[in-house]
Amino acid sequence: MAQKPDGGAGLRGFQAEASVEDSALLVQTLMEAIQISEAPPTSQATAAASGPNASPQSSQPPTANEKADTEVSAAAARPKTGFKAQNTTTKGPNDYSQARNAKEMPKNQPKVAFKSQNATSKGPHAASDFSHAASTGKSAAKKSEMAFKGQNTTTKAGPSATYNFTQSPSANEMTNNQPKTAKAWNDTTKIPGADAQTQNVNQAKMADVGTSAGISETDGAAAQTSADGSQAQNVESRTIIRGKRTRKINNLNVEENSNGDQRRASLASGNWRSAPVPVTTQNPPGAPPNVLWQTPLAWQNPSGWQNQTARQTPPARQSPPARQTPSAWQNPVAWQNPVIWPNPVIWQNPVIWPNPIVWPGPIVWPNPMAWQSTPGWQSPPSWQAPPSWQSPQDWQGPPDWQLPPDWSMPPDWSFPSDWPFPPDWIPADWPIPPDWQNLRPSPNLRSSPNSRASQNQGPPQPRDVALLQERANKLVKYLMLKDYTKVPIKRSEMLRDIIREYTDVYPEIIERACFVLEKKFGIQLKEIDKEEHLYILISTPESLAGILGTTKDTPKLGLLLVILGIIFMNGNRATEAVLWEALRKMGLRPGVRHPLLGDLRKLLTYEFVKQKYLDYRRVPNSNPPEYEFLWGLRSYHETSKMKVLRFIAEVQKRDPRDWTAQFMEAADEALDALDAAAAEAEARAEARNRMGIGDEAVSGPWSWDDIEFELLTWDEEGDFGDPWSRIPFTFWARYHQNARSRFPQAFTGPIIGPSGTATANFAANFGAIGFFWVE
């Protein structure tokens, strides 16, 4: 029973005032009351054993008659379990420890039901421990069952509680025929103000006395622990208070140790029933029918059972196609060569034959079809049409069907009168039968393989020459403005910016512009790339003295001539390292900005490459990557290898023939260039005669006011945005200068190189640029 905090003083006063005799008498009275209330009246045997500290008044020695009665009742009852007394030692006001003490009884005593408890108090404030041996009532064999309850109550009062009352649970030895076990309740009550929490768990265990060295009993006195591990279980319901959290633990078959951890105990022997197994009415896939399958929680495949594969129905047997009876052939003819048509024949509409046509060979045309001929087919020379074959009346031939030239028509083959011949169907050398005189042979006969192209061209449409010439003059001004940056001009740009709606006659407009450039300014329009259609402006030999002159690009062109010579002398290609090494000998370094040339690296790798003077590419299979320089497309048209070789020989005071390999290569290239120039001049003259381009194209007023500067890009307009600053010469002054110097006797430009006779003028010009050749 829990007491208030001031109740602790009353217990201490009771302990101090009570004498030893009163305490012993109180203990004896309590023991007798417990024995009288619990033991049956017919077979009650009381045995009390006092400890060494007990007083003589607390226990009386039994007489001889009482001992005899005790032995007779013990032999009749045959108790199974002996209880061990507990020895409780109190070491301090807040420290409690219990130790089990089993005392050895004399051998002359056959059975001892209870053992006394030894209570020792240490210190002035030691707690008083009252331990009472529980009495065990011996039940007779006729009793069906007996259950005893032992209560263990531990009460702590106040923060310095020092009293601990412990009662060992009373247990009854059950016989083999008893169906029920004893239950024990452990109630622990704690006052809210207590400092410590104590759990006192006392369990009644069945122990094997025969194996204990401290307890000796006669046969049948102690209960043997069965081999299957069955033992009395203590079912307890505990309430554990930890701070502000309370949880209730129902310990079923759980054994607790002193540290508080839990472990699962072995199940007692006996029949037990598992959870019901759900039953499914559907069979699993592949299972035999009419079988009730049970699906446990963890289903395992029975040994040896395998899922049966679903039976596949064999495909229905298809009947073989009906055998077709071959038609009877009339007059079979052996083919000597396969039928190969020169061009494929594509029918526009399906041809419906009125009657099945039987060919001399093994071919039967059943229904309308898209008939295609095999190219290269030639009819055999001995082939003849069947005499009774006639073409259908409403049959029309394909529009582009071409007959082989040596194919002979059958004599009795008649065409319908209203059958139109497709264009380009009948070759010119094909003989016309006599009965074809009523047809129109002349428009359909072709004279050459390119007759379709000639028909598409047709007669020249009437055009306004003045409008075409006006558009050509605008193109001339446009080309001269675009060529200022030396970037090749694309044909698509000319069509987009100038020609525009005259796209169908753009070849004539371009040719008229070329004629004006040559006659007025001594400039030639060259197509350097036939695939991308790139055009450049180069000077003609008649205007070499005036077109170059001295401009801001003269130093760059001189450096370009030196670079082209280095590339040519190194096998038409020079790596970047070789080129820069040669330029260093001339005082030019890639990291130093030149006052006239600017950034040398940008000039070589960007400007000259964009202008198509040089070709800058990576060396194949180079690791780390290396780059090399080659001649560009513009360099092949503005100069030649022979001119570059003469320039090198002039600088080094040597003969060009000293470099035999380079001289032979340059000579071959010069001959090829002459042949190409002659063929181009002939083709150009023929085209101009066909177009009617003559001196009237350059006659008439010429004005620069209609120059469309808005067509120029930002890069083409220049740094200051002044379109006129891009013109390197005065147009009319240059025109008159070119007119006076039609056939110059000496070359004064460094880009062209020296002529056959070296002049001091060339050396002076090249020396003024500041470049010197270094071996």
UniProtKB/Swiss-Prot annotation:
Domain named MAGE: residues: 468-666
Subunit structure: Interacts with DLX5, DLX7 and MSX2 and forms homomultimers. Interacts with UNC5A. Interacts with TRIM28 and PJA1. Interacts with NGFR/p75NTR and RORA.
Protein name: Melanoma-associated antigen D1
Membrane association type: Peripheral membrane protein
GO process annotations (BP): circadian regulation of gene expression; negative regulation of DNA-templated transcription; negative regulation of epithelial cell proliferation; negative regulation of protein localization to nucleus; negative regulation of transcription by RNA polymerase II; positive regulation of apoptotic signaling pathway; positive regulation of branching involved in ureteric bud morphogenesis; positive regulation of DNA-templated transcription
Region: 22 X 6 AA tandem repeats of W-[PQ]-X-P-X-X, residue numbers: 293-441
Sequence repeat boundaries on the chain: 293-298, 299-304, 305-310, 329-334, 335-340, 341-346, 347-352, 353-358, 359-364, 365-370, 371-376, 377-382, 383-388, 389-394, 395-400, 401-406, 407-412, 413-418, 419-424, 425-429, 430-435, 436-441
Annotated Polar residues bias: 52-63, 84-100, 150-180, 223-237, 250-260, 297-330
Gene Ontology cellular-component annotations: chromatin; cytosol; nucleus; plasma membrane; protein-containing complex
Localization in the cell: Cytoplasm; Cell membrane; Nucleus
UniProtKB keywords: Biological rhythms, Cell membrane, Cytoplasm, Membrane, Nucleus, Repeat, Tumor antigen, Ubl conjugation pathway
Spans annotated as Disordered: 37-330, 374-407, 437-463
Record's function text: Involved in the apoptotic response after nerve growth factor (NGF) binding in neuronal cells. Inhibits cell cycle progression, and facilitates NGFR-mediated apoptosis. May act as a regulator of the function of DLX family members. May enhance ubiquitin ligase activity of RING-type zinc finger-containing E3 ubiquitin-protein ligases. Proposed to act through recruitment and/or stabilization of the Ubl-conjugating enzyme (E2) at the E3:substrate complex. Plays a role in the circadian rhythm regulation.
Organ and tissue specificity: Ubiquitous and in the seminiferous tubules expressed in Sertoli cells but not in germ cells. Expression decreases in all tissues with increased age and is detectable only in brain cortex and lung.
Any one GO MF annotation of this record: JUN kinase activity
Induction, as annotated: Follitropin decreased expression while lutropin and prolactin stimulated expression.
Comp. bias intervals (Low complexity): 39-50, 375-406, 437-452
Primary gene name: Maged1
